[in-house]
UniProtKB/Swiss-Prot annotation:
It comes from Aplysia fasciata (Mottled sea hare). This is Attractin. Disulfide bonds join 4-41, 13-33, 20-26. The lineage of its organism: Eukaryota, Metazoa, Spiralia, Lophotrochozoa, Mollusca. Keywords: Disulfide bond, Glycoprotein, Pheromone, Secreted. It comes from the Eukaryota. It holds the Pfam family Attractin. Its main location: secreted. GO terms for molecular function: mating pheromone activity.
Length: 58
């Protein structure tokens, strides 16, 4: 059960990329990180809503 709170996701992505030295690209990288994490969260919520008991792709 991941923390799908957007503030949580933002801080996780910023921590992951805190050593990023591409001044122009870091924000883009962080945005992409947030987007993919949000999508993963939504997919997990969808799977649990459909009553699936298996984790991950089969």
């Amino acid at each position: 059960d991941q923390n799908c709170d957007i503030g949580n996701i933002t801080s996780q992505c910023e921590m992951q990329h805190q050593n990023c030295d591409d001044a122009n690209g870091c924000n883009t990288i962080i945005e992409e990180c947030k987007t993919s994490m949000v999508e993963r969260c939504q997919n997990q919520e969808f799977e649990s809503a459909s009553g699936s008991t298996t984790l991950g792709p089969q």
